[in-house]
């Protein structure tokens, strides 16, 4: 049965809203690239499997970054996959560096850009050194905000800079995606940024931005709520407020509340089933509990008739061996 939302929209608007054309183009490209493998299973089965994987959120695994970030659904799916794959890090209380979290991201998306990981880490670390250790939950919620709302935050950074320089907020020019790449995020070390900007004025600018920024923008009412208890704020203080706001996390819908972050019985059962299918892996994990904290640099691959559709590559990264730590942030 069709949902009321579907019936209220013309066909072309609904297809555009759900990015159906993006998935059709991707499916056809994969069909053509792997037609010899797919011919033995049938085209109808291929499309069934492909769109089932889209619905389940597994279609983004081991894909190129341009596809992972192509639609809101892809971004939510990637966030959920990262959480479910590596929540053991948080469950065991391990603290990792930015470079180590980036290695984990590259296990799911080999060409994941380092810049995005650095920006997410900066939200947690603020003015601390970038080689400090972070808890899994702190990094995950900061990464969620940075990754899902990336374009919106680039525009917010430009607005913040303009307010710091004393420009009239009514004449703020929001950069395009191309021009925004050349503007640097505000540095917390500057004399002006320590005092921040007036929260009410900042929100007025963000409200206007949200009206125009339909693709990737947190609900304005929740943004206002996040700023309601402060008179002035810094740019990274604003990002930290977004990352800790329960309502924004629930509106995005990718991750559970912080208190439930380490609980996923269905995934635990599925992981046990998959691990049992990999010869030698269960014994090695049992013999060395610490080994389960982080994935191997060369994880075993489980064969699948559809696996050629995902272009996985080996990635490697090394920790800088830092021993500094950051405490778990309070909710």
UniProtKB/Swiss-Prot annotation:
GO terms for cellular component: centriolar satellite; cytoplasm; microtubule. Residues 288-331 are annotated as: Disordered. The keyword S-adenosyl-L-methionine does not apply. Residues 1-111 are annotated as: Required for interaction with PCM1. GO terms for molecular function: protein-macromolecule adaptor activity. It is found in: Cytoplasm, Cytoskeleton, Microtubule organizing center, Centrosome, Centriolar satellite; Cytoplasm, Cytoskeleton. Belongs to the CSTPP1 family. The modification Phosphoserine is found at residue 319. GO terms for biological process: regulation of protein complex stability. Interacts with PCM1. Interacts with TTLL1, TPGS1, TPGS2 and LRRC49; the interactions link CSTPP1 to the complex TPGC. Binds to alpha-tubulin. Residues 318-331 have a biased composition (Acidic residues). InterPro entries: CSTPP1 (IPR038968). Regulator of the tubulin polyglutamylase complex (TPGC) that controls cytoskeletal organization, nuclear shape, and cilium disassembly by balancing microtubule and actin assembly. Regulates the assembly and stability of the TPGC and thereby modulates polyglutamylation of the microtubule, which antagonizes MAP4 binding. It comes from the Eukaryota. Its main location: cytoplasm. This is Centriolar satellite-associated tubulin polyglutamylase complex regulator 1. Residues 112-331 are annotated as: Required for interaction with TPGS2. Keywords: Cytoplasm, Cytoskeleton, Microtubule, Phosphoprotein. It comes from Homo sapiens. Residues 1-225 are annotated as: Required for interaction with TPGS1, LRRC49, and TTLL1. The gene is CSTPP1.
């Amino acid at each position: 049965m069709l949902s009321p939302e579907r019936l209220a929209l013309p066909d072309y608007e609904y297809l555009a809203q759900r990015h159906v054309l993006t998935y059709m183009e991707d499916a056809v490209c994969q069909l053509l690239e792997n037609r010899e493998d797919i011919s033995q299973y049938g085209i109808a089965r291929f499309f069934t499997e492909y769109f089932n994987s889209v619905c389940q959120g597994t279609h983004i695994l081991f894909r190129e970054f341009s596809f992972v970030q192509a639609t809101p659904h892809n971004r939510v799916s990637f966030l959920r996959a990262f959480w479910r794959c590596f929540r053991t890090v948080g469950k065991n209380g391990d603290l990792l560096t930015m470079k180590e979290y980036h290695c984990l991201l590259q296990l799911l998306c080999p060409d994941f850009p380092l810049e995005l990981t650095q920006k997410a880490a900066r939200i947690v670390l603020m003015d601390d050194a970038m080689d400090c250790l972070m808890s899994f939950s702190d990094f995950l919620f900061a990464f969620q905000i940075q990754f899902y709302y990336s374009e919106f935050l680039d525009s917010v950074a430009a607005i913040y800079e303009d307010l710091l320089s004393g420009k009239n907020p009514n004449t703020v020019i929001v950069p395009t995606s191309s021009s925004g790449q050349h503007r640097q995020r505000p540095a917390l070390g500057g004399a002006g940024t320590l005092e921040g900007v007036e929260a009410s004025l900042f929100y007025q600018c963000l409200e206007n931005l949200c009206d125009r920024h339909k693709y990737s923008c947190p609900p304005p009412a929740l943004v206002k709520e996040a700023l309601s208890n402060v008179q002035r704020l810094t740019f990274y203080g604003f990002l930290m407020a977004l990352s800790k706001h329960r309502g924004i996390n629930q509106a995005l819908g990718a991750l559970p509340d912080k208190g439930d972050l380490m609980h996923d019985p269905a995934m635990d059962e599925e992981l046990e089933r998959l691990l049992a299918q990999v010869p030698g892996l269960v014994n090695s994990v049992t013999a060395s509990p610490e080994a389960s904290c982080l994935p191997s640099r060369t994880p075993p691959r489980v064969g699948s008739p559809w696996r050629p559709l995902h272009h996985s590559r080996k990635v490697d990264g090394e920790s800088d061996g830092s021993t500094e730590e950051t405490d778990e942030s309070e909710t």
